[in-house]
A protein has these predicted regions:
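Non-heme Fe(II)/2-oxoglutarate
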Residues: 1-75, 201-219, 231, 241, ...
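Conserved hydrophobic/aromatic beta-strand scaffold that supports enzyme active sites
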Residues: 3-5, 87, 110, 154, ...
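Residue-level detector of conserved, well-ordered beta-strand and adjacent loop positions
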Residues: 7, 88, 174
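Phosphate/oxyanion-binding loops and surfaces in catalytic or ligand/nucleic-acid-binding neighborhoods
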Residues: 23-26, 116, 196
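Conserved double-stranded beta-helix
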Residues: 30-138, 168, 192, 202, ...
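Extracellular/periplasmic catalytic domains that process cell-envelope and extracellular macromolecules
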Residues: 102-105, 156, 182-183
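Double-stranded beta-helix
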Residues: 129-163
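Charge-biased low-complexity segments
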Residues: 144, 150-152, 161-162, 168, ...
Length: 299
């Protein structure tokens, strides 16, 4: 997984947008709640207006959105929480040049409250360096032209869109050219999914996963000890039946990466992980349990 895009993510999006617009609708109004922005500027790298999202919005709508985001991260990524989210506004001249986020969290997110369909500005897309560039010479063809679409993936900040991506990949925000009015800028809530750990919905106790994790560790240890240079997050989802069998095993998110010459070893490791889970016997319970199991590899 390098990128996940979820449109129409949160029913709270319209309420959050209304809250923002109500505060900044009248530029001559000088109430205290308007004085919230940090102009974050690192020359040649970052320029944006930002403020803590949880302090900006009305509590009811924001709390509902925050819980939706957290639960999505648990069920989809196996990440227990999110970092304290920022609310950032990009007006004329704002941008983020290419950078990688280390070690903030295994998955970054950007949730857009931008009126993208009616925007008056240019730019504002999320940019990610393509994998072909990260290993540029391996697939190089001297007769093939290379222009920006072959170098960068571009993701529009559509309203109510959640974008989750591997933050190790160099990424940024295309420079915004247009209005200085915050209500006409690129508006996003962003941060990182953090604290990968097992998540269970159902009667299976978390302690019951210890045997499965031990089995997985034993299965993949020889490959890792042989020097497989693997790094990233592998999150698996499965259902444990009342009889204790793991079924409906699926990969929810996989940011594991190796140099290309080690790709067969990576595939072998992933196969061993699946086999270890499929053959493990869990304790019997009266009803099924839904499990998200994240595995973190570092080097």
């Amino acid at each position: 997984m390098r990128l996940l895009v979820v449109d129409r993510f949160a029913k709270e999006a319209k309420a959050l947008r209304r809250d923002f617009e109500a505060r900044f609708a009248d530029p001559r109004r000088a109430t205290a709640d308007r004085f919230v922005w940090d102009l974050w500027h690192v020359a040649g790298q970052y320029t944006a207006l930002r403020t803590p999202a949880w302090e900006f919005f009305q509590k009811k709508a924001y709390d509902a959105f925050h819980q939706r985001l957290v639960w999505w991260g648990r069920r989809t990524l196996g990440c227990h929480d999110v970092s304290p989210p920022w609310l950032s506004c990009y007006v004329n001249g704002c941008e983020q040049r290419l950078h990688g986020d280390l070690p903030h969290g295994p998955v970054a997110f950007v949730f857009s409250l931008t009126k993208w369909a009616t925007r008056s500005f240019r730019g504002g897309q999320t940019l990610l360096l393509r994998d072909e560039v990260l290993d540029f010479w391996r697939g190089f063809v001297s007769t093939r032209a290379v222009e920006e679409p072959e170098v960068l993936d571009e993701v529009p900040a559509r309203f109510n869109r959640l974008v989750a991506f591997d933050p190790r990949i160099p990424h940024g925000v295309r420079r915004v050219d247009g209005s200085m009015d915050p209500t006409e800028g690129r508006l996003v809530i962003h941060g990182w999914f953090v604290q990968p750990r097992p998540f269970i919905e159902g009667p299976l106790p978390e302690k019951a996963l210890e045997g499965a994790i031990h089995r997985i560790t034993g299965a993949i240890a020889p490959i890792l000890e042989a020097g497989l240079p693997l790094a990233g997050l592998l999150s698996l989802g499965f259902t444990v039946t009342p009889a204790g069998k793991a079924t409906r095993l699926r990969t929810l998110a996989d940011t594991t990466r190796t140099p290309k010459e080690h790709a067969p070893g990576r595939r072998r490791l992933l196969s061993l992980v699946r086999k270890a889970l499929e053959t493990h016997v869990f304790p019997r319970r009266s009803s099924p349990s839904r499990v998200t199991l994240p595995l973190v590899f570092e080097r």
